[in-house]
Amino acid sequence: MSADRIIAIFAIILAVGFDFVNGFHDTANAVATVIYTKSLKPGVAIVMAGLLNFLGALLVGTAVAQVITKIIPADAVTLPIVVAVLLAALIWNLITWWFGIPVSSSHCLIASLFGAGVAAAGFKGVEWGELRYVILGLLISPVVGFIGGAVMTWAALKLSGEAKREDQKAPPQLMRWLHIIASASVSFSHGSNDGQKTMGLITLILATHFAEYGYTVSIVPPWVMALAASAMALGTIIGGWRVIRTVGTKISRERLSHSQGFGASMSTALIILAASHLGAPISTTHTLSSAVAGGTLSAHGRDKLNPSTLKLLALAWILTIPVAATLAAVSYYALKLFWHA
């Protein structure tokens, strides 16, 4: 087996590692609200999230994966680019996880693709039509999440009659079960969108370095779908408690109510599922964090939002693109020093 083939296999392992980290970094997206409202015990919530992440990644088509494979032109893809992209995304994901900052794995990946593509071939190394489509989705989803969280929370409070007087130790059973269903839907939708990003990267590696076996960028092999789904599910079950605490307790100064948790989770699930069907790789992290903020505003007013946490989230959102792109570019140049390609 040639050195390039061995390194290509290593790149696939890195992609699976990214999916695993994505799972435990983004566990908070699915289970933070349902844990901190005491609707489910933490262990039950995390196992549920892992199983539904697996099913979402496996069952909801590959439209997002197809978009990921097209951000860098197929004839320009080299192993140094792919390895640089994965290293940059992994490093930034792990740094932010360590500090409990809920950043977007999607932002990491898209920015890394941009940075490595430009480093390798200048601005011709990126398909700008595809990139504009992706960036639009990443920009719009937090805004829609904020509005959706506010509207859903308002509706849930009105329909349930709970207002602001919920008993956190004994949640109303109807709202509790609706919240659990909404949380399960976030897990499923997260798998459907984020799992496809790794599928796209692995398919890109296979199409460019194992083409004689019939692999192309237009078809995601079933074994790749199963591998990506399994890695994300395992990462989700292991969990990322640092991020869970931030989403569950620090965005709002008031403890999350059951109606608020339902509103944030259900609006996030609907937005992510719609994006998955449209092939838009958007951020579950930013969508849900915005929905929690919108729900807090709707339920308790502006004074109950935690400005320091919101500023930290905004800073991480702003920094992720330049930092991940720079990490990918630096990684690419470093790899090229030791690469014959």
Please give the residue ranges for each predicted region.
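Multi-pass alpha-helical transmembrane bundle typical of ion/small-solute transporters
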Residues: 1-341
